[in-house]
Regions:
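Small-residue (primarily alanine) positions within well-ordered alpha-helices
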Residues: 11, 15-18, 28, 38, ...
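Conserved functional loop/turn residues at catalytic and ligand-binding sites
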Residues: 22, 70, 94
Length: 156
């Protein structure tokens, strides 16, 4: 069975697809029973859908693959710590484990800016594993935003 690094590399490949599409490079995959059942990359601009974050796209793909919106026992791998919307989707989908690459200090809703998955009112708990391939995950998004800032400065 593949380990965390291997599945996170799959998520990084999805993030590369987002980058190539001009989107913020975030990628996600869903694994169930050791098998890849869902993939997604960040695509709100491409799809004109503000909810089309990598995690949501991957959860939707997995739900279609498994013919069930409840993804009990599944693990979601994502390159960057999920936002509040995506953290909520993990709970609603009953995902068993979240594995993320790099923290998101401004909007990370799992450990950084808030701890949404720890709220006592939730009816489902998601186990969390952080910092898998952290340098690669952080590096991809930092390079993206550095290039954007550089391009914006050239236009001034």
């Amino acid at each position: 069975m593949k380990g965390h690094d291997s599945f996170m590399r799959e998520a990084l490949r999805q993030a590369q697809r987002a980058l190539e599409a001009g989107e913020v490079p975030v990628g996600a995959v869903v694994v169930h029973g050791g098998h890849l059942v869902g993939v997604g990359f960040n695509q709100p601009i491409l799809s004109e859908d503000p909810t089309a974050h990598a995690e949501i796209v991957a959860l939707r793909d997995a739900a279609r693959t498994l013919d069930n919106y409840r993804l009990s026992g599944a693990t979601l791998y994502v390159t960057i710590e999920p936002c509040l919307m995506c953290a909520g989707a993990l709970v609603h989908a009953r995902v068993g484990t979240l594995v993320y690459g790099a923290a998101e200090p401004k909007t990370g809703a799992v450990r950084s800016a808030m701890r949404a998955l720890d709220h006592p009112s939730l009816n489902h708990r998601v186990a969390v594993v952080a910092n898998i391939l952290e340098d690669e995950c952080r590096g991809m998004i930092q390079e993206f935003f550095a290039a954007r800032r550089h391009a914006a400065n050239k236009e001034m």
